UniProtKB/Swiss-Prot annotation:
The gene is GPXHA-1. This is Glutathione peroxidase 1. Belongs to the glutathione peroxidase family. The active site is at C41. It comes from Helianthus annuus. Gene3D superfamilies: Glutaredoxin (3.40.30.10). InterPro entries: Glutathione_peroxidase, GPX_AS, GPX_CS, Thioredoxin-like_sf, Thioredoxin_domain.
Length: 167
């Protein structure tokens, strides 16, 4: 009987903000920070500012941020994908990819988020708690840590450096 291999981030295909399929295997070999984002949250300004700082500092070293808009928390991401991308790219000058708006909890939760949450039930209580929850994924496509919404993206920098082999 063949042994089924362990799932990785690279086993998933998601939609970008324009509705095109993106095979996450394109991020193979990179350290990835995955964040559920919202435009009208109290955490928005600081989170995007710090995510941009980290992205610009490490993108050439094998680091990527994947942002997934989500409207499940306080209806704080009500816009269309086009409006969200325009907001993020205009106001914050973000260069990292913004994907299709998704659910991160419940029966319609995106499969990639079901995968990310596996193994972090004790920390998360089984569900994402709010906007700007963060998952750090290693170069092998395995989630290695998760961070609360209130955890500053800059606080995650040392963990990113370790996974990139910079420490």
């Amino acid at each position: 009987m063949a042994t089924q291999s362990k799932k990785t981030l690279y086993d998933f295909t998601v939609k970008d903000a324009k509705g095109n399929d993106v095979d996450l295997s394109v991020y193979k070999g990179k350290v990835v920070l995955i964040v559920n984002v919202a435009s009208k949250c109290g955490l928005t300004n600081n989170s995007y500012d710090e995510l941009n700082q980290i992205y610009l500092k490490y993108k050439e070293k094998g680091f990527e941020i994947l942002a997934f808009p989500c409207n499940q928390f306080g209806q704080q991401e009500p816009g269309t994908n086009e409006e969200i991308v325009d907001f993020v790219c205009t106001k914050f000058k973000s260069e990292f990819p913004i994907f299709d708006k998704i659910d991160v909890n419940g029966e319609n939760a995106a499969p990639v988020y079901e995968f990310l949450k596996t193994g972090f039930y004790g920390i998360l209580g089984g569900d994402i708690q709010w906007n700007f929850s963060k998952f750090l994924v290693d170069k092998n496509g395995q989630p290695v840590d998760c961070y609360y919404p209130t955890t500053s993206p800059l606080t995650v920098e040392r963990d990113i450096q370790k996974l990139l082999g910079l420490l």
